[in-house]
Structures are given as structure tokens and as C-alpha cells.
């Protein structure tokens, strides 16, 4: 599966909104819970560059009340 540029950013922003938070509120939660920078511009830049680490995504999911679950998809040949 090829992922289009901007797809990950859009998905993360959508999940933040679906959880009932603004980007600024999500950044504040990450700062409080995990010691992230409280800079919204830094977080936005990471999303734009698609440079979030897997650990970062897990922490973001946690503060939003989500859990990342790997689900087996189609078999590859």
C-alpha cells in the first residue's frame, strides 16, 4: 500500500478532532503527560514533515484515549 503525501497528517488531525480536542489541547496534554514541547508550531511541523516516531504516535493515541491495534490485513504473495 502506497501512502500519499499528507495522508498521515490528515489522519492524525482527524483523530484529534474526533476525540474532541483541538491541536493546541492535544499538544498541552502531550506536554503534561509525556514532557513533550508545548509548542503547537513544533507539533505542526512534525506532522507536515511526517517525522513523528512510532513512540510519539503511541503517546498521542494514549492522551486522546485511543489504543493502537495491529490487525492482520490481506495476505501478500
What kind of region is each of these model predictions?
Residues 1-23, 29, 67:
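A short, Lys/Arg-rich alpha-helix, primarily the initiator
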Residues 28, 32, 62:
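Alpha-helical residues within the helix-turn-helix
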Residues 2-3, 62, 69-77:
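Short, charged recognition helix plus adjacent turn
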Residues 53-69:
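DNA major-groove recognition helix of helix-turn-helix/homeodomain DNA-binding modules
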Residues 31-52:
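Recognition helix of helix-turn-helix/homeodomain-like DNA-binding domains
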Amino acid at each position: 500500500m502506497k501512502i500519499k503525501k499528507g495522508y498521515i497528517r490528515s489522519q492524525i488531525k482527524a483523530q484529534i478532532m474526533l476525540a474532541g480536542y483541538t491541536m493546541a489541547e492535544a499538544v498541552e496534554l502531550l506536554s503534561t503527560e509525556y514532557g513533550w514541547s508545548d509548542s503547537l508550531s513544533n507539533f505542526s511541523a512534525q506532522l507536515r514533515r511526517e517525522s513523528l516516531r512510532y513512540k510519539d504516535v503511541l503517546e498521542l493515541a494514549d492522551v486522546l484515549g485511543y489504543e493502537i491495534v495491529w490487525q492482520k490485513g490481506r495476505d501478500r504473495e
